Amino acid sequence: MPQRMGSFANPNDIFFDMSSFHWNVLAIIGARHVRKEDVKTKQDVIQYLSEWSEFERAVYLATFEIPCGKVCTYQRIAERIGRPKAMRAVANTLHNNPLYPIVPCWRVVKSDGGFGGEEKAAASRRKHVESEGVLIMNGKVVIRDDVLF
């Protein structure tokens, strides 16, 4: 039988499910929570990332908009979000993408068309971009105006 908080006679008798607690609190305060598997639109992304920093939200939203068959550079994303010198911060943010594969971080490349990071991860991103029809030569995206977003 669940115990009231403050009347715990035996710690083994405590029944407290944090996930239920989380949803109950959200219901009480009227907040809408979006589960990762329900994220499909730009508005869903905004809502899912509501507690993330403004910078992180901007990076993930800019990346979310990159269409299949196109790539964008870390530099261009940094410029798009108004932080032109923050290329490395963009890369670090995308490295921790909480909305993979909804936010297509594999479509973001270095300015020379290369894939940064560890070779195994870079090879996976390279393969993914190539499967979307992007031309790869010598392990890098061939940067052309018709491919850049």
Residue locations for each model-derived region?
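Intrinsically disordered, low-complexity segments
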Residues: M5, D17-M18, Y48
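Nucleic acid-binding interface residues in structured DNA/RNA-binding domains
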Residues: N24, I28-F149
